[in-house]
Design a protein with these regions (language model features):
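Non-catalytic cap/lid and distal C-terminal segments of serine-dependent acyl enzymes
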Residues: 2-387
Length: 387
């Protein structure tokens, strides 16, 4: 395991009032004239972060993210690895061989990054790759595809590699202009579009055909990644993401995620709000650049849906969880829904092909994203050439 990779597990429940202050504070800035833009948050709206002294946080794999292992290190040549070259340091294979964790060194970020990988049903021949991103917590908390969904079971009979990085908490999976005291060095666009794909292709013998999908915060990120690397992905799927980032409303939400929750500086990310860095990372402004990529977007209305009740998966019989999910999850998803409608209108005006699902109910919650993935998968599979 990479040095400093420590567990940060679980979103504390039962703190609804504090959650409302953190998230609703941003919404009060963003609701004007009936127009709402989304606060891209992680899976479960998290409590306000406590003061950590503004130091970089470190994280650790849980039993979910680290399978029972057979570790395959890179051959020792006797020489120190070149810090300017990204590499796969170790591959840890779980029982059955379909689940693996690769420890990847990123030269741009100068650190090891765990990558969760689901291998295809038939690994004897090349398969395409779906890059599947977590939300604001980066998978370092309990809010991750592996911890909150049955995605491993879903992909077990499919001939595709599913690649999910663990990290990037509150980073928007973007290249930050400056290092940040709280969130460290973030060069995620470089890592995800330039460093990681060739390593995955070489080590796992892929077809070099890719798609990408993400939820919440990463629903914004995947659109930007596809814009920045137009030939890398056949398709992009944004589940409950918000495409608008550079207008005052979008800036308020990013401040809520990066600043309020992450204790990071948004000026370290893209510069001063309103400057070129923000416009360059606004999928709404740059929507025309998605013309040659299949685009899928989903969102709910924010009204309670089938998983927003006691006894439902993810809620069980916890009243605090249900209150968080309905109040905060509903508020966030209502804003995301409007943002998705705005992006739909923008892409329609530009005549950029895309598909949108706006559900009449549903909150900002994992069970709906798990269903979104299953709903959109046949389209992504077709894009990737998976039969």
């Amino acid at each position: 395991m990479p040095k400093g990779y420590v567990v940060r597990r679980g979103v504390q429940r039962g703190r609804l009032a504090r959650n409302v202050v953190v998230i609703a504070g941003a919404f009060s800035l963003a609701i004007a004239g009936g127009a709402v833009t989304a606060v891209p948050a992680g899976a479960d709206p998290a409590p306000a972060a406590t003061d950590t002294g503004n130091q970089p946080a470190t994280t650790t794999p849980t039993a979910t993210t680290t399978p029972t292992v057979t570790a395959t290190p890179v051959a020792d040549t006797g020489a120190e690895p070149d810090p300017a070259v990204s590499r796969i340091d170790t591959v840890i294979t779980g029982e059955g061989g379909q689940r693996a964790t690769a420890i990847v060194y990123s030269a741009s970020m100068r650190k090891m990054i765990p990558i969760e990988i689901l291998r295809p049903k038939d690994s004897s021949k090349p398969a395409p790759t779906l890059y599947l991103l977590n939300g604001a917590g980066g998978g370092e908390d309990s809010a991750s595809w592996s911890a909150r969904t049955d995605y491993e079971k879903f992909f077990a009979d499919k001939n595709v590699n599913v690649v999910t990085p663990i990290g990037g908490t509150f980073s928007y999976y973007t290249d930050w202009q400056k290092d940040d005291k709280a969130l460290g060095r973030n060069k995620w666009t470089t890592f995800l579009t330039k460093e990681l794909p060739p390593l995955i292709d070489q080590r796992f013998g892929t077809t070099k055909t890719n798609s990408i999908a993400g939820i919440s915060m990463a629903g914004t990120s995947v659109l930007n990644l596809a814009i920045n690397a137009p030939k890398l992905y056949k398709s992009v799927a944004a589940f409950s993401g918000c495409a608008r980032t550079s207008d005052p409303l979008g800036q308020a939400y990013i401040q809520a995620v990066v600043g309020t929750r992450g204790h990071g500086s948004i000026t370290n990310m893209w510069g001063l709000p309103g400057t070129a860095g923000w416009r360059a990372n606004d999928p709404y402004i740059n929507a025309a650049k998605l013309r040659d990529t299949k685009v899928y977007m989903t969102s709910g209305s924010g009204l309670p849906g089938p998983y927003d009740r006691l006894g439902a998966k993810g809620v069980e019989n916890n009243l605090d969880s249900l209150a968080n999910q309905i109040v905060l999850g509903g508020l966030i998803e209502a804003a995301v829904n409007q943002c998705t409608k705005d992006m739909n209108k923008r892409m329609t005006q530009l005549k950029v092909p895309h598909e949108v699902i706006n559900r009449p109910t549903d909150t900002h919650s994992w069970e709906y994203w798990a269903q979104d993935l299953k709903t959109i998968w046949p389209k992504i599979a077709k894009d990737l050439g998976v039969k």
